[in-house]
Every structure is written in C-alpha cells, then in structure tokens.
Amino acid sequence: GAGGGIIGLIVIAAIVILPQLLGSSGDGDIDPAVGESAGPTACVTEIEQIVCGAVDDVSLYWERQYPESFQGTFPGTDTVFFAGATQTGCGRASAQIGPFYCPVDQLVYFDLDFLQQLQDEFGATGDLAAQYIVAHEYGHHVQNVTGISDRVRQLQGRAPGSANEFSVALELQADCFAGAWASSVAERDLFDRPGEIEEALLAAEAVGDDRILESAGQEIDPESFTHGSAEQRRQWFQTGLDTGDPEQCRTFNGALAP
C-alpha cells in the first residue's frame, strides 16, 4: 500500500494520469469495464452519495456549458465504482491508482476504499476533495471528446523534450475546468458553508507535484513535474472559479492552435 495520510498523497497524484500509469494512449484492445455504475443502487454510503451528487451536478453543468464553449452536444460519460481492482478499456487497474479517467472507454473510475479513507482522514474536507476529483476527471473527459488530449499526444510525439510540460498544461486545464464548475455551484449558493471554496483550493494544492514529492521525502525537481506545482494547481482552479468560463482555461499558451 501507499502508507499514511490520504493514502500517502501518492495515490491522489494518480487521480489524473491513467494513460501514463497503464501505458495506454487510446490504442489496443478494449476490455469491458468491471464494476458498478454510479446509479441509484451504487449510491448507498455517505461518500458514495457525495460522489454521485457531484457526478450528477458536473454532468448537468457540462450539458449546459459544452455547447457554449465547444461545438455540438456534450457526449456524456459514466462513473464506475470498484473495489480492489477492475478491468478497464485502458487495462487492469488496481486500487493503488486511485480515481481515474480512461480515455478508451470514456469512463471515470472511483475506488470505494480510497473514497472511504479520504472521508475518514479528512471528514468534510474529504467530501469537498471527492467533489473536486469528480470535476477534474470530467474535465479530462471534456479534453478527450474535444480532441484536446489527442493534440497534446501529437505535440508530445513531435517534441519529446517538452512532453512533461504538455502533461502539466493538460492537468492544469482540467483543474481550471473543475474551477469553472465550482463557480456554477457558488452562483447557485450550493456550498454548505463559507469555507468550502477555500477547501477546494486546498484540495487542488494538495495534489501539486511539489507537495507529493515533499511528502514522499523525494527531491523536488520542476523538470520532472507532470501535473503542476501546488501554486499552479491552485492558480488555475482559481481562474476557473473566478471566470466561470472554460474558454479562459488557456493553459497551453496557444500551442494547440491548428
């Protein structure tokens, strides 16, 4: 296992990078997902209900927002709960990977034990962290169905030396998309208490590469970052939160232009 708090924070680092972890770039045989879809029968425990509520709200947000920010109708995804390990379109995934998005079968996966430990360790803050994870993973789905992820992989292939830089930009954009969703929640006065927005920002910081390396006792080397620093992740979540506009999530500095 990964050891202490939030499963060592190492697992939370993995909530966003399934293709790298499982060696999938969207090619190869697709195995069926094994688990329970996040329908009514799956939303039983408190943490499951929190995730299911976030899934419903994030889905509705993108159904409304997608036609404005991108072209066409939002191609929805689904969330699969699993325990221990599961088979996905990206290969076999264990609980050590944590929550993730698979671009091949276009599904979001949540390990139930991970979510329960998140809540046990952090209480209400864990609830907000779980919602942040949902919004972030749905951001990866948006990147996938809009072709952003494909363009990033092409750029990484043409410029291997900048591969990590493009990975960071992809993750920061998903953080910004999550912030745009959180902005819609704030507009509807759906946060339970004033401190929840700050908790979301702290959740974004907690998965910064520098924080994760520091907690693991490893040297902090910005050149090795694949997700962004705590400051960057907070900054881009804040950008989405402040603007409420996914089109302002310009983390690539024009690199994705045709």
Which residue ranges define each predicted feature?
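Extracytoplasmic low-complexity, Pro/Thr/Ser/Ala/Gly-rich segments
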Residues: 26-82, 249-252
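Catalytic zinc-binding patch centered on the HExxH motif and its immediate surroundings
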Residues: 27, 84-111
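Short helix/loop segments within enzyme catalytic domains
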Residues: 49-71, 169-212
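Short pre-active-site segment immediately N-terminal to the catalytic Zn-binding motif
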Residues: 114-132, 162-166
